[in-house]
Amino acid sequence: MRNKICEELNKSDIGKEVNLCGWVDRRRDHGGVIFIDLRDHSGFMQITINPEDGETLFKQAEILRNETVIMVNGIVNERPKDSINKNIITGELELKVQDLQILNQIKNNLPFPVSVHDYENTKEELRLKYRYLDIRRGKLLENLKTRHKIIKAIRNYLDNSGFTEVETPLLTKSTPEGARDFLVPARLSNGDFFALPQSPQLFKQLLMVGGLDKYYQIAKCFRDEDLRADRQPEFTQLDIEMSFVSEEEIIAFNEKLIKHIWKNVLNINLNEDFPRMSWQEAMDNYGTDRPDTRYGMLLKNLGEILGNIGFNIFTKAIQMGGAIKSITIKNGNSSISNVRIKPGGDIFKVAQEAGAGGLAFIRVKGDELETIGAIKNNLNKDHISNILKITEAEDGDLILLGAGSTKIVNQSLDRVRQYIAKDLNLLENQKAQSQWNFLWITDFPMFEMNEEEKRFEALHHPFCSPKNVKFEDKKELTKKIETSTAYAYDLVLNGLELGGGSLRIHQAEMQKEVLRTVGLTDHQIDEKFGFLIEALEMGAPPHGGIAFGLDRITMLILGVDSIRETIAFPKNQQAKCLLTNAPSNVSKSQLKELDIEITIDE
């Protein structure tokens, strides 16, 4: 049908006859001549139709509506100088049409304009419902092309590094990995269910047992969890696993991979080594294991100074094994009012939503500290001097304080820190926006305490190899459970986790001991992970790997706010596909075939 696409045309095509196909982006009548901007996936080409070209042809062109699908045949001409459009690649050319065929008319008025000339901010619900039109608008189409470039760069790099791409099953066994599984009824085994994989974790480990050595996969994964701007119920991850490697080798290799992606997609050279920070250091200084290091306001520990001044909230926090921490907002006295910090204020609400009861504050005015009487009346000169020294606060600065359990204090001050950074436009200056602050977080704890259930849970997952616990002394794991760290690592970029991985446990007895530690009985271990334990008993090599969130990498490279802008057909924040109305009811006959009966609580 076509022998050229729009943006292939250049001055060497002048005088040549070509066929083009695409959509009518817009039609204009000027002095009896019809000008049509023809749009295809590559770009635009102006086509012209004169009355003297034929009555039938001219009448066809007169009735064309935007988004009509057409094919045109004509001669490429140079545009008159006064009509050159420097905003498009073909802006010096036009096509004088000899023949026009309408391939498809639009039936009704479109739900929103598609042409870039009529582009408007359209509600996301409408964009998701008519996603094919949204793609046709161009911006989303370019996002998908960038995603393709990222995947291509990944495949080229890993293929050249000796990796083998292997597909792992999508219908698998339900195993506890943190989030809820999506379950699929098994018709041939009534009463049993498959689960869609939350990750290919166990299968890629089994591939290492099988001697594959280096594996990767662009893997679809599924998690039935509450959604955020950077979460989807089905998502794509780059999954990598390697045999006979150290933690250092995995980190170094994947750092080179990330640098390769940034160079090939953005033409950005990331020459410096990515810095590293222990999990404990991140929690102490930022209150989170995925810190945004583009700006300051680090958390400072004031427990030793304020824990014994007689202020009840502070005293109780320390007595209960908690913390008193602060962040310092430079020139905060002039930019943040008391109303915003007190109950009902926006900053107070941010802390409250993160679990805090509230915030205390100290305003630095010269050598004096201004705060509530219950705090100020108990501060002596040494207290004031030490507070200023630790917080690095100066005249005009505002100190915000949180007190309570260490987890809540970290969590709330982290959220407040992020909120204030946006509120004060700390990331709006060009330097901050252009920064790619990659950071490896290492030395994660093996376990964390589930306070509600009073039991330990694996912080990453229960297949991470513990540090400094020899196979022969595996009982040390139980004895030192609260201080055990793992060969686990995350890569963080500008406050978002790009990926995470670990060295895996490759000895069966050690794996069983870890699973017992997270509360599984030997019977449950055999029932849920017996196939893995058996494989580890058959000569499993030392191995480890990492998984990167491909949707999130694409989101950051594109500079968009939601991973929905990187996916062709995403779900909304209620995990629904507005295009197909999935999920939806199924027929009674389908349910009967599966021996499933649905009851809905009133």
From Swiss-Prot:
Compartmental location: Cytoplasm
GO BP field: aspartyl-tRNA aminoacylation
Enzyme Commission identifier(s): 6.1.1.23
Molecular function in Gene Ontology: aspartate-tRNA ligase activity; aspartate-tRNA(Asn) ligase activity; ATP binding; nucleic acid binding
Residues the record lists as binding ATP: 223-225, 232, 497, 549-552
PROSITE patterns, A to Z: AA_TRNA_LIGASE_II (PS50862)
KW Cell cycle (keyword) present: no
GO (cellular component) term, any one: cytoplasm
Keywords, sorted A to Z: Aminoacyl-tRNA synthetase, ATP-binding, Cytoplasm, Ligase, Nucleotide-binding, Protein biosynthesis
Residue numbers spanned by region Aspartate: 201-204
Enzyme type, top EC level: ligase
Chief place where the protein resides: cytoplasm
Xref: CDD domains: AspRS_core (cd00777), EcAspRS_like_N (cd04317)
Site (Important for tRNA non-discrimination) location in chain: 30
Binding site for L-aspartate: 177, 223, 460, 504
Origin superkingdom: Bacteria
Reactions catalysed, as given in the entry: tRNA(Asx) + L-aspartate + ATP = L-aspartyl-tRNA(Asx) + AMP + diphosphate
General function of this protein: Aspartyl-tRNA synthetase with relaxed tRNA specificity since it is able to aspartylate not only its cognate tRNA(Asp) but also tRNA(Asn). Reaction proceeds in two steps: L-aspartate is first activated by ATP to form Asp-AMP and then transferred to the acceptor end of tRNA(Asp/Asn).
Stored PANTHER family: ASPARTATE--TRNA LIGASE, MITOCHONDRIAL, ASPARTYL/LYSYL-TRNA SYNTHETASE
Subunit relationships: Homodimer.
Family the entry assigns: Belongs to the class-II aminoacyl-tRNA synthetase family. Type 1 subfamily.
Name assigned to this protein: Aspartate--tRNA(Asp/Asn) ligase
Native species: Prochlorococcus marinus (strain MIT 9515)
Gene: aspS
